[in-house]
Amino acid sequence: MAVIYYDKDCDLSLIEKKIIGIVGYGAQGHAHAQNLRDSGLKVIVACVEGGRGWKKATADGFEVMCVAEMAKKADIIMMLAPDTSQAKIYKDSVEQGLTPGKMLMFAHGFNIHYGQIVPPSFVDVTMIAPKCPGYMLRQVFTEGAGAPSLIAVEQDASGKAKEIALAYAKGIGSNRAGVLETTFAEETETDLFGEQAVLCGGTTSLVKAGFETLVEAGYQPEVAYFECLHELKLIVDLMYQGGIAYMRDSISDTAKYGDFTRGPRVINEETYETMGEILGEIQDGSFAKEWILENQAGRPVYNSLRRMESEHLIEEVGAELRSMMSWLKKKK
């Protein structure tokens, strides 16, 4: 079972005199910066000068500067820019500011695990990865609670990398919920697999396959949309709240019997084999290489697939039906 750290394991005093630099002020960046500041810590923010993040961080009262200047000043540098831009930011602006005793920190292990960023041996390299969106990390903190995080240590030059990272986790409030120990490899590989096989790739492909099956059989696209996409949230919310068993206790016996007997025919042995292949491509680095080259080439495949998917009938039908849902309009 995993090792989980709580408040008694986290000593905020270890970083009270340190300067924490946050690279990026987007979904995660704003939450980290504000939570750390509210915990009494010194925080500076680095963004593209004049950009949206720069303006927002300035309006929120932070000292904002370019990444190179921040890298020289900060003792702990948290990389919260998009994964695809981190390697360039590091090479152009962060690397030259690193000196012995500093810590380079990440919220996702991709660039370290796949060698896109190779820090010098004299700095600590750690990860604190909150398991929730940035807005939720901030919200639960202000309510006096916290969101769970993962912690990993890739490089311990100081001999206190884990302790310092745990102090950071306390600064963002994760000590209140629990900080689960992992590795850069495990976090990266499981995160990518979850996205590709289940959360994003698996779910969207399953939804579209169900929708297309009903439409091709002559059913109205609008009804197919309701049954295969719209109602998905109802089921996922139940699973999120209490797990699979809780969800099954909340649905009809007819639905439950169909789940038990038909579900394994949809996700069958062939599906397991394909999932194994997808995991293998993540583990051996071939997916990472493919994605890195795709970005270097200007994303031709990505852009083509994105355009093609946006033209699927399910998008047209969904837009029409969602326009009928007043509660969705209120959220925009």
Swiss-Prot record:
Residues 1-182 form the KARI N-terminal Rossmann domain. The gene is ilvC. Pathway: Amino-acid biosynthesis; L-isoleucine biosynthesis; L-isoleucine from 2-oxobutanoate: step 2/4; Amino-acid biosynthesis; L-valine biosynthesis; L-valine from pyruvate: step 2/4. Substrate binds at S252. The active site is at H108. Mg(2+) 1 binds at D191, E195. This is Ketol-acid reductoisomerase (NADP(+)). It catalyses: (2R)-2,3-dihydroxy-3-methylbutanoate + NADP(+) = (2S)-2-acetolactate + NADPH + H(+); (2R,3R)-2,3-dihydroxy-3-methylpentanoate + NADP(+) = (S)-2-ethyl-2-hydroxy-3-oxobutanoate + NADPH + H(+).
